[in-house]
Swiss-Prot record:
Molecular function GO labels: nucleotide binding
Top-rank taxon: Bacteria
Protein name: Nucleotide-binding protein Sde_0533
CC terms in the record's Gene Ontology section: cytosol
Keywords from the UniProt entry: Nucleotide-binding
Amino acid sequence: MPSFDIVSEVDEQEVRNAVENATRELSTRFDFRGVDASFEWKTDQTTMRAEGDFQLGQMLDILRNKLVKRGVDPESIDTSTPVHSGKSWSQVVTFKNGIEASVAKKVVKAIKDSKIKVQVAIQGEEVRVTGKKRDDLQEVMALVRNGELGQPFQFKNFRD
C-alpha cells in the first residue's frame, strides 16, 4: 500500500546562513549605525538584542526576509515577547522542528474530516498516511499544503 510521512523540519544550515546574512545587513544599514544591535545564533533559536523595541521589530523583518531568500518558510519561527533589561531589549526567535502533538491531532482531524479513504497515524514527531491509491495520497498532500495549520509541512518517504 502506498504511504508517506508528513514532517516539519527546518534546514539548520540555511537558518544559520540567514542569521549570518542578517548580521551582515545590520552592519551596513544606516538606521543601525552607532546602535548596539546583534543576532546570536544557538541551536534552534536566535536571540536578537537592540537598544529599542522598534529596532527589534526591524531586526525581525530583516531576519524574515533573509529566511525567505534562503528558502526557509517564515511560518516556522516562534517569537517570544520582547524583554527589557537595563538599556537593551532582547527577543528570542525559536525555529519549529517536528510536529507537536496538538498540531498532529489537527492534521489527523483535517484529513479524516475530508472523507478521503486513507489511514492516518501519529508516529512521534511525524504523521504517517497510508492509502490504497496514489491519487488519494496526492489529495491529502494538497489538503495539508492548503490547510492553515500554523506550521510548514514537508512530505517524505513516499512509497508506492
